């Protein structure tokens, strides 16, 4: 029941005023119950105190989307995904949700590709986002565009067997045996088993 949920979250916010997680959750509960202004105010309060709070950034982006403010939604999503202080795992989770949403809505993949490209310009130190991007490109039949991204995955994480195997399969298909040898030798070096 909603009344108890509100009471419980509000009491946690009062008990732990410095823990922004409860404030964001309260904003989310407000949003789920049609209290959009209260939700917005809670997200803004958290972001005023902690501008790099990924949970609040994502919730605010969701708020903009649900209230039909598409430009602000995209801007907030960019702020979250292009912020170097947001952990890679959080960005990866947000991108997964974004990709699923775009696919479910039947929207043009250029938005997804453009956002991935902008994230990768930051030279990620984690192979998760480039790997997700490569998988997305492959799912769209954009193999030519996916293979350089897979090479980027290997540059970040030489032990990434999935990326190496996809590249190896493509090299065999193209009968590029020099590339096959290079990929295999590098694979044995990084993964002797």
Per-range role (PLM):
Residues 1-193:
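Alpha-solenoid helical repeat scaffolds
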């Amino acid at each position: 029941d909603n009344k108890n949920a509100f009471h419980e979250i509000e009491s946690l916010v009062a008990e732990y005023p410095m823990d922004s997680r409860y404030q964001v959750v309260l904003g989310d509960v407000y949003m789920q119950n049609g209290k959009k202004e209260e939700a917005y105010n809670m997200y803004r309060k958290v972001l005023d105190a902690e501008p790099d709070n990924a949970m609040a950034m994502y919730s605010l982006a969701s708020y903009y989307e649900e209230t039909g403010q598409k430009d602000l939604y995209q801007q907030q999503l960019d702020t979250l995904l292009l912020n170097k202080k947001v952990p890679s795992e959080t960005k990866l989770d947000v991108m997964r949700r974004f990709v699923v949403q775009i696919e479910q809505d039947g929207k043009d993949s250029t938005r997804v590709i453009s956002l991935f490209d902008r994230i990768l310009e930051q030279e990620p130190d984690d192979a998760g986002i480039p790997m997700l991007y490569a998988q997305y490109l492959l799912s769209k039949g954009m193999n030519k565009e996916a293979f350089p991204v897979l090479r980027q995955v290997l540059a970040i994480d030489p032990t990434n067997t999935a990326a190496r195997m996809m590249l190896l399969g493509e090299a065999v298909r193209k009968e590029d045996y020099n590339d096959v040898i290079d990929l295999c030798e590098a694979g044995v070096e990084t993964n002797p088993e």
